[in-house]
């Protein structure tokens, strides 16, 4: 793990840890169908501008606490990296969450945490909220910000804004898939 000694590194770690981004969509499909989509991590690469591939490790398709999957991400600058994720919550049809492991592999000290919350609506649809929380573990954002401490605030803000935009785009794509499945009666698979 890279350490950032001194006040600049400490400040960067403080500013990155707890960084949060959220997005939300109303979907004209029931929570069960929406949950089945968000819990199928293999579909994320088709929806997200950043995540280009994900696959279950071990038993495929088992969205349950403790299950692991890999995610491959690509940033606008072309940098690609692969992460290992651990499912922390699989409460159909209400919530699905996971942590992204840093290089220590400790789920209690993740690089980031992701969570979908799915609320039923009176009309039979769903409100889907997605939340990203950074840290406290190591990440590429920490590394980039530490290399340019004078620009760290801007780098961190740009990442937060990029996350929000990417999360919104992914939710819109998932919404389209859910609403198509609901309208046609064909399952989300």
Region spans (language model):
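Glycine-rich portal/gate segments that line the openings of hydrophobic small-molecule binding cavities
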Residues: 56-113, 165-188
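Conserved long hydrophobic alpha-helices within structured protein cores
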Residues: 1-2, 86-95, 126-137
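Beta-strand/loop substructures that line and gate deep hydrophobic ligand-binding cavities in soluble
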Residues: 101-162
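Well-ordered beta-strand positions
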Residues: 26, 88-89, 119-120
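A generic "alpha-helical surface" signal
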Residues: 25, 161-165
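Hydrophobic ligand-binding cavity/cleft-lining segments
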Residues: 1-65, 189
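Active-site phosphate/pyrophosphate- and oxyanion-stabilizing loops and adjacent acidic/basic residues
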Residues: 42, 85, 116
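Intrinsic-disorder/low-complexity, polar/charged segments enriched in Ser/Thr/Lys/Arg/Asp/Glu/Gln
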Residues: 18-26, 31, 68, 82, ...
